Amino acid sequence: METAYTYDGDGNIRTLETKAGENVLLSFAYQYDGNGNRTAKTGMQAALGGITAGNNALDISYNYDVRGQLLEERRNGASVCYAYDKAGNRIRKTDAQGETRYLYNEKNQLVEEESPADRKQFSYDRQGGIIEEKNAAGIRLFSYNSRHQQTRVETETGSVQENRYDAEGLRFELLENGRRTSFVYHDGELLQEEGREEQKTSYHLGAGMEAFRRGQELSYYHRDEQLSTVFVTDGQGEIRNSYQYDAFGMSLGTTEKLNNRIRYTGQQYDELTEQYYLRARYYNPVAGRFMQEDVYQGDGLNLYAYCGNNPVVYDDPSGYKRKACPPQGKISESVDESGTSSVAKPNHGQGFSSKGYNPKPGERTRDQRL
């Protein structure tokens, strides 16, 4: 499995091509404006069912306002448009389904979202976290601990997710309707999870997630320019999982044969709550906003906005502050059949290898290098 990149003079990705043997899984070319905003993405990706089953063409363009906020994403001719107020709150979204409107209070907290399909109302605690969402299906409840970390979500159907955190603030345990999953991290990156059907999943790190091993089976991640998982393949190059997202990470289509939580921008997706775990906070990709205030206050006065409303160029894996995604600079990556991963880029050491290492849930690991 191999991904090749070319770059322009500013370090922006110009082309991306991912191959499984001689077969092309992904092939894209990109264009940028004078401010470094990505304005076009054109190319193809393999169709689900195998690399010989045909290809899907993609032609995506992006338009921005003078503040760099995304105004329009046009995908194969279908347009999604956004409008914002002076504080950077999304006040309107228009797509093929119609118009969605958003209302806010004086604290930039979303209090109502009305779409052609539903009307949602939100309530907050004193620390600025959503504690209640009322919608057509019922009521969704959220709870937090003294550090204002989200500890419990009860959905409209009565399903419950509980989150537990270690002393450094990382989620080391997750309970979904009582089913427990434990996590091990390396330098803040997910290294291992254990709990689903008693199976252990080990992740192999490079420029993000490269592969995962579950039992004797090694599966490979294939990612786009935002490091979002597009495909998961097996060792023979057969596509097992396929994902599509809009610019803000809302799912446009998911097909899975393998359980996988690593999705948009390479981060953990919680299916039960439909949120992304971004360490300090949880992100709602449908609303394009965080569920809690930013205690760091690193990205302006709006404490809920995701990446300054420019998710095409930036991501926020810490939940504190946006960063360029991917960082400017050349990236090369590969994973061999043993599961050893490597990466090389400016100011970055050799890749981390978890080959042969078996940490315990909750354990901190030392840096192991090839």
Predicted regions and their residues:
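Beta-strand elements of repeat-based all-beta scaffolds
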Residues: 1-21, 27-55, 59-63, 69-74, ...
